[in-house]
Amino acid sequence: LLYADLIGHWQIRNGEALEYTDPAQLDLAELTDLTERYGGSEMIDAVHSGKGISTRNGAETTGGLAELDDYSACEITEATDIKSLFVDRFYFGCEADDATNAWAFNTKNNPFDAEIKTLFGSDVGHFDVQDMAGVLPEAYELVEDEKITNRDFSHFVFENPVRFWGETNPRFFEGTRVAKEAQALLSSPVGAPA
């Protein structure tokens, strides 16, 4: 949801889009004409007196900000740049019992058909877990309920966690039960079948 929201906001708040809301672009003559033709008497009086109307745009009207494009620091020039920055670089830890985990794999709803990288964040240590053995099966309920596929589940509980920890520390899984499988995955290109 955050990913889609970033793109949605970029579309209306990038530097070029902000030009449409720049008070300096306000055509006062046109506003006055339209108000006189279609506005009520209170609106006409307000426009004539300049109440609530400003064509100033600068540091004094923007809290001292010179750059209003919130996305400029990331050098985003088109919406697909957000996918490259967000989807390729971020992982999100998720609890086993959170049904909204399925959204990460719903490429039909995610902009540019993106799959968001989720990490199975085991709930085993949580105070409200009544049975530690039930945490992983609880996560698998997303597959049983047909909200995600077995492939998605593998990404959630294995592939994404292995890439997250193993790409920053290739020895992370040494000595573990999954060392061989983790090494095989880390040796394969991203997106290759596990």
Question: Where are these predicted regions, by residue range?
Answer:
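Internal, charge-rich low-complexity segments
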Residues: 1-46
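Mid-to-C-terminal alpha-helical segments outside catalytic/metal-binding sites
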Residues: 29-83, 89-91, 95-117, 126-194
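Active-site glycine-centered loops adjacent to acidic/histidine catalytic or metal-binding residues
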Residues: 123
